[in-house]
């Protein structure tokens, strides 16, 4: 896999079991959905606890360029969004899947030409599915991948479309989020292998309903693999953003691999975020996991167990789980994640390559990874401009000397300041190593 090293970060080795409380910023997935819905709303909205990361800031910049008012209200995480007539503009997607897949439907309703581009790595990410679907709904689009151009005509007909969303749930979410503003709404039917990351579609549906939009799903009497959004107003909602649970997983993994304790406050008792699945995963690997009074606490075991798990619905957790598995006793099988080959990088090949370079024993399968315990050693860990690859390297570096993570700054995609948070976690832990560590 081609990769150019940008800089090296020496992942700090834990000198003792970690013992820390880690407060996480807002969810990227919820923040960017709230921004789209606020842009389409029938009045101004306020978003509190918004994530301010590269992905979120790219979404904000794009909306501003298209004519939406987005202003900070007192602090950077509180945003006031004022809808306005959509106009032509330029959209820099960076590496953000939510930007490149959620904004084209909005752009199709602009009055003017909207040009999309992004980072070089983004030009290989699959987009043809949603762009072809939009053409079928009446949009004028040139191109099937970045860069592409949407010629907005001020409105979009909408209607019924059949797609293969087995590559990404974002194809479905992207069409649903703007569909209430389409003249006919939209009916999206999926035809293909199972859609990955279904919790993200559940998140989209829940937020649409909170905005007063009528949504019919397979779970509410609709046809199988079919989602229907009726045309109508999007109600202005004041959004309070949950912490990003997927970004919490490296810190919780730190407790698991060092036999320590990490607590994360403001953990929701009920959520559509896929990151919530880390609770059951860590428990299956031997950790003690409790959620009480909004605080999730993970206490690591003496010995971490391997795991056999289907991660199809929670694929974004794969780098964290792979790092855990590489440090566990017993073989692990991570299944149902063939779609990760189309993420920021081919995450399956990247994880196998990087763990094996450190002495690991990882084999790619058709739909996942098999990870056999092996003695790991230090070395360079490439991030492939992928934020979750970088944090996976940091996890391994907690217990393996000399792991140097390249381009750790890519974590700013969803978690700015990750390196400082990681060091703060270690510095808040006891200085005296335990004998069992």
UniProtKB/Swiss-Prot annotation:
Give the reaction(s) catalysed.
Answer: 3-phosphoshikimate + phosphoenolpyruvate = 5-O-(1-carboxyvinyl)-3-phosphoshikimate + phosphate
A molecular function (GO) term: 3-phosphoshikimate 1-carboxyvinyltransferase activity
Q: Which BP terms in the Gene Ontology apply to this protein? A: amino acid biosynthetic process; aromatic amino acid family biosynthetic process; chorismate biosynthetic process
Q: Name one Pfam family in it.
A: EPSP_synthase
The kind of enzyme this is, by top-level EC class, is transferase
Instruction: Describe which pathway this protein belongs to, using the record's wording.
Output: Metabolic intermediate biosynthesis; chorismate biosynthesis; chorismate from D-erythrose 4-phosphate and phosphoenolpyruvate: step 6/7
- Gene3D superfamilies in alphabetical order: Enolpyruvate transferase domain
Supply the name of the protein: 3-phosphoshikimate 1-carboxyvinyltransferase
Q: Which organism is it from?
A: Rhodococcus erythropolis (strain PR4 / NBRC 100887)
């Amino acid at each position: 896999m081609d990769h150019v090293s940008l800089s090296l970060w020496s992942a700090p080795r834990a000198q003792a079991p970690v013992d820390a409380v880690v407060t996480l910023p807002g969810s990227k997935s919820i923040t960017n959905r709230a921004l789209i819905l606020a842009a389409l709303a029938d009045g101004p909205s306020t978003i509190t606890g918004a994530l301010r990361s590269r992905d979120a800031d790219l979404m904000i910049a794009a909306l501003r360029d298209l004519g939406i008012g987005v202003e900070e209200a007192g602090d950077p995480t509180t945003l006031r969004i004022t809808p306005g007539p959509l106009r032509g503009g330029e959209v820099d997607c960076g590496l953000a899947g939510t930007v490149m897949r959620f904004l084209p439907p909005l752009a199709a309703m602009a009055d003017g030409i909207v040009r999309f581009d992004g980072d070089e790595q983004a030009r290989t990410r699959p987009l043809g599915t949603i762009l072809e679907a939009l053409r079928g709904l009446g949009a004028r689009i040139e191109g099937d991948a970045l860069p592409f151009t949407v010629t907005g005509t001020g409105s979009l007909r909408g209607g019924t479309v059949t797609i293969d969303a087995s590559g990404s749930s974002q194809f479905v979410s992207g069409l649903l989020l703007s569909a209430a503003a389409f003249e006919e709404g939209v009916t999206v039917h999926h035809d293909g292998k199972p859609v990955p990351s279904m919790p993200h579609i559940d998140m989209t549906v829940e937020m649409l309903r909170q905005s007063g939009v009528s949504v019919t799903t397979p779970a509410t009497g609709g046809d199988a693999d079919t989602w229907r959004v009726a045309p109508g107003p999007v109600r202005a909602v004041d959004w309070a953003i949950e912490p990003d649970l997927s970004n919490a997983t490296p810190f919780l993994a730190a407790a698991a691999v060092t036999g320590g304790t990490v607590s994360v406050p403001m953990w929701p008792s009920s959520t559509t975020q896929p990151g919530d699945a880390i609770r059951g995963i860590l428990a299956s690997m031997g950790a003690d996991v409790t959620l009480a009074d909004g605080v999730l606490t993970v206490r690591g075991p003496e010995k971490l167990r391997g795991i056999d798990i289907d991660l199809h619905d929670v694929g974004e957790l794969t780098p964290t789980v792979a790092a855990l598995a590489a440090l566990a006793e017993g073989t692990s099988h991570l299944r149902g994640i063939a779609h990760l080959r189309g993420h920021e990088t081919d995450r399956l090949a990247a994880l196998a390559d990087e763990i094996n370079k450190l002495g690991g024993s990882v084999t790619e399968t058709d739909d996942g990874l098999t990870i056999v315990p092996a003695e790991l050693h230090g070395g360079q860990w490439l991030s492939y401009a992928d934020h979750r690859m970088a944090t996976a390297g940091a996890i391994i570096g907690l217990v393996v000397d000399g792991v140097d993570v390249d381009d750790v700054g890519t974590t700013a995609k969803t978690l700015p300041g990750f390196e400082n948070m990681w060091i703060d976690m270690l510095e808040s832990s006891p200085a005296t190593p335990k004998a069992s560590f």
